[in-house]
């Protein structure tokens, strides 16, 4: 037998055991925190004094790596220049009609 719609709604809204029934809707939820003015420390001017020695040493190493990075970037620029030059040479050979010369190092001959 079908239950009356009113009875079904009451069953659906029945609170679970050990749970308070709370109305659906606005209700009282958590309130937003208000700005609390308190004492605050301004940011440290020299951040190294607040850091452990290990981190300060790492920063010194990172500063030293700047030279390595500059060297690396210079090598990359040099490689790009060489690649561009080789590509240009190859393109010019194709345009001129001069096929690349094979050195035949990878070929071998079987003698009878």
From Swiss-Prot:
GO-annotated biological processes: signal transduction
InterPro entries recorded: BEX, TF_A-like/BEX
Transport is among the record's keywords: no
Region of interest (Disordered), ranges: 1-56
Keywords from the named record: Cytoplasm, Metal-binding, Ubl conjugation, Zinc
GO molecular function, one term: signaling receptor binding
Record field: compositional bias (Basic and acidic residues): 1-12, 30-51
Keyword ATP-binding: no
PTM comment text: Ubiquitinated. Degraded by the proteasome.
GO cellular component: a single term: cytoplasm
Compartments in which it is found: Cytoplasm
Stretches the record annotates as His cluster: 101-105
Annotated residues for binding of Zn(2+): 109
PANTHER family per the UniProt record, alphabetical: PROTEIN BEX1-RELATED, PROTEIN BEX5
Stated family: Belongs to the BEX family.
Record-given protein name: Protein BEX5
Organism: Bos taurus
Lineage: Eukaryota, Metazoa, Chordata, Craniata, Vertebrata
């Amino acid at each position: 037998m079908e239950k009356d719609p009113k009875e079904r709604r009451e069953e659906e809204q029945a609170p679970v055991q050990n749970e308070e029934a709370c109305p659906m809707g606005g209700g009282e939820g958590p309130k937003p925190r208000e700005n609390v003015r308190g004492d605050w420390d301004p940011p440290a001017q020299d951040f190294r004094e607040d850091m452990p020695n290990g981190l300060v040493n790492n920063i010194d190493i990172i500063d030293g790596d700047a030279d390595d990075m500059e060297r690396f970037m210079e090598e990359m620029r040099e490689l790009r220049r060489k690649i561009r030059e080789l590509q240009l040479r190859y393109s010019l050979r194709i345009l001129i009609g001069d096929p690349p010369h094979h050195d035949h190092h990878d070929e071998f001959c079987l003698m009878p």
